[in-house]
């Protein structure tokens, strides 16, 4: 009987491939937060009236939707937090495309459940120069029907990975996150485009947003 010997380099490749698969599975499990069975948001639909809101951005400037819409369309982006590589990647893509968005007479506004000190971390990771709002008490996210309660199992899993959602968001009794949704709002305060998918890995191409800015 002939025995097949695995060389050191071959063994290294096998181990490397296995570790890569395990790492990929860990990331998938870690960042997969399922929606609570009791609360499954659907998001607002096209032609819905966009709820007005006001909040302070990272520059200390108070921003009100109704006032902003007097001069421009608004691309409203909801994201989960600086701990999410999927959010950071997309926010960076939006920053890179910001000049194109501005040529469409539109303003980009991002909304996060995270406290200001964590929004600073988002900016460091993405170079975002557009307004990012801290949605204290989830008022904006609930108004746009994108907020969902995070289940205890997911909260524990994140804590085991040194991600404390309660501390990051300043939430106590219940922990909420948004579905990473996007709305385009017309000057008439109506929603003319929406992207809403509970799968946190899916985001629309920036070109799709540009095509709907009119």
PLM region descriptions:
Residues 23-34:
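Bacterial N-terminal signal peptides
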Residues 35-52:
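N-proximal helix/coil linker or "cap" segments that precede and/or mark the start of modular domains
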Residues 54-73:
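A short beta-strand-turn-helix
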Residues 68-94:
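Short active-site neighborhood of thiol/selenol oxidoreductases, capturing the structured segment around
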Residues 89-145, 149:
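Structural microenvironment flanking redox-active thiols in thiol-disulfide oxidoreductases
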Residues 137-200:
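Thiol/selenol-based redox catalytic cores and closely related redox-interacting motifs
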Residues 200-213:
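A short, polar/charged loop-to-alpha-helix boundary motif
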